[in-house]
Every structure is written in structure tokens, then in C-alpha cells.
Amino acid sequence: MDFKFTDEQIMIRDTAEAFLVENCSSTAVRQFMDTELGYDLNLWKRICDQMYWQGLLVPENYGGLGLGYVELVAILEQMGRYLCCSPFYGSICLGVNALLVAGTEQQKTIFLPQILAGKTATIAYTGEAGGWDSHSIQTSYKKQGDSYCLNGTYRFVPDGHSADILVLAAREEGAQGEEGISLFILPTKTSGITREWLPTIDQTRPQGQVIL
């Protein structure tokens, strides 16, 4: 089995490296990692407008590039190498993946074009204890007519204080363990959401707290 990059994947990797060498100097990284937002908005705009990395995993019929995880890894390796502070991980690795795996056709049609246009996304999963297993989901939901009511607190949400779109993991009231878990997606401007920056040791990956 051949694990080497293809010529196209090598080109993607090398193009990413050249872009990041030019735009992610140590000085720039230190400047923006100390801010509450945690990244340079102008850099994110250049990533979206010039590189179109936000479209990497999005199928072509939604306006994306329709590439795969090997191409994603090629870019992530370079982002890690140059400590690129950006909402790419939360938006693409988490948000887009959640939509592709679990989203309805209507949700994909609504939210994928927004992410392609530069809006940011993330997943809120961990409860106050910070675990990533199913038992750590502390937010509950119940159905009220045609709507759902969610209550709970999420901690250590990547870009949770700044993302435009939230994918929320919640458990139905009364359910235990892996039972009754659903994902909800909504704009962060939805009423009833309180968000705040949660400073952590690794300032290159901003975390937030989300309260419903």
C-alpha cells in the first residue's frame, strides 16, 4: 500500500507552507494569541478568499472543493508547524464534519454556504468537567411543541466565544449514557445563549464557555 502523497497533495502541502511562511511569523502569532479573539481576522479572510481552505471537505454540489482527509492532513500539518492561529479547526474539522455526517439536507443547504463565505463554526460538547466521552455531555434538551429547549453549560469549546455557528451536543431529559444524544445547530446570535472567553495554557487554540 502506497502512503506517499500524490502530486496534487504535494502541491496542496507546498502551497500551504508557502502561504503560512509569509503570513504566520512568530511575531504575528504572539501578537494575536494574546487577544481574546485569538486570531487575525484579516488572515482568516485571506485564507478564505485566496486559499479557500474552508471549502476543502465540502462537496462540490454545495460549492466546496470536494477533497478528502489526506488533503486536510496535509494542510493541518503545515498549520501546526507554523502555529497558525485561526478558526480552521473548529470550523472545518468540527463544524463542517458534523454537518456532513449528521446534518439534514436543509441544514447543509443553509449552513455550508455560510461557512464557505467565511463564517466560523464549532462544536460544543464538553460539560463543566471537560470530558469528551458520552457521559460528559451535561446539557439536556426537551421538546416543547415544534421546538426544543436546551439547558446546560459547555466548557473548553474551541472558538466557543467567537464562532458564528454552534453545533451543540445534548441529551434528552431523563436519558443516561449514550442514550438520547442529539446534535443541534444554530446561529450564536440566538437568544438565550451566553458566551465568554475561557483563557487556557495554550493560547494558540482559543477556548470558550457557552451557557444555555
Label each PLM-derived region with a short phrase.
Residues 16-26, 103-107, 145-151, 182-193, ...:
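Long, well-ordered alpha-helical segments
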Residues 66-75, 133-137, 186-187:
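Structural signature of FAD isoalloxazine-binding scaffolds in flavoprotein oxidoreductases
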Residues 136-139, 156-157, 187-212:
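Flexible, small-/acidic-enriched active-site or ligand-binding loops
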Residues 1-89, 110, 114:
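Amphipathic, small/basic residue-rich leader segments at the start of a protein or domain
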Residues 86-106:
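N-terminal glycine-rich flavin-associated loop
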Residues 151-196:
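A short core secondary-structure module
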Residues 133-151:
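Cytochrome P450 C-terminal beta-domain/meander region
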Residues 117-127:
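A short, Trp-centered hydrophobic/proline-enriched beta-strand micro-motif
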